[in-house]
Amino acid sequence: TYLRAELDSLFSMTQEEELGALSLGELRELAGRFSVARQKDRFVARSKAMSFMAPGMGEFMNKDYGSGAALLAADLAVVAGTLAGAYFLLPEDLRFQQLDYLNTPWAAIRGRWESHTFMDYLPSMALLAGGGLVKGILGRLSSTHAGKLARRNIEQGKITFEPDLLLLPDGGMMMGMGWRY
C-alpha cells in the first residue's frame, strides 16, 4: 500500500532523529505525505470495490470508458440472461401468462407455488446459482483490473491528490458515525 511505503520511507530516513527535534513545518510536511498516501490507498480500494459490486464502474472512475462499457454490458447481459432463463425454467403454471400476480389473492398464489416439488424448481435454481457464479467471477476480474488501472493512473500522475491535514477517521463524521464504500 502507499501508506506503508511512505511509513517505511520515513522510518528509514529518520531512525536517529528524535520526534521532538522535528519542526512544525517538518511535521506538517510529514502529515501531508501521509494524507496523500492514505488518499491513494482509499482511491485504489474504492475503485476495486465499485468494480466488484458493479463491473465497469471502477473503470469509469479511472477514465477507461471502453473497458468500463464492455464490463458493464457483460454484467447486464449476465443478469438479464440469468433472470430470463430462470423465469422460463419455472413450471409453466407459475409464469405471468398463467397467473395474474397483481389481481390474484395471495393465498391462491402461495398455494400454486407450494403445489410444486423441489425438483420442479431445481433447474431454475441451478441457473440462478450459475448466473451468480458468473457474475461473481466477472466482478472479481473487473475489480482486479480497476485496481491495476488506479495504481497505474496514480503512478503516471493522471490522478493526483492534495495534502489534507484534517485526517478524519473512516467515514469522516466523528463520534463513531460514518459511511463506508
Predicted features by range, described:
Residues T1-Y87, A108, W179-Y181:
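N-terminal targeting leaders of membrane proteins
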Residues G20, L27, L89-M119, E155-K158:
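A subset of solvent-exposed loop/turn segments in beta-rich extracellular surface proteins, enriched
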Residues D41, K48-M50, Y121-M125, L168-D170:
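Transmembrane beta-barrel outer-membrane domains
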Residues G58-G66, A80-L94, L133-I154:
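Short hydrophobic alpha-helical membrane-entry/anchor segments
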Residues S67, H116-A129:
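Hydrophobic alpha-helical transmembrane segments
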Residues L71-L76, M125-L133:
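Hydrophobic H-region at the start of alpha-helical membrane spans
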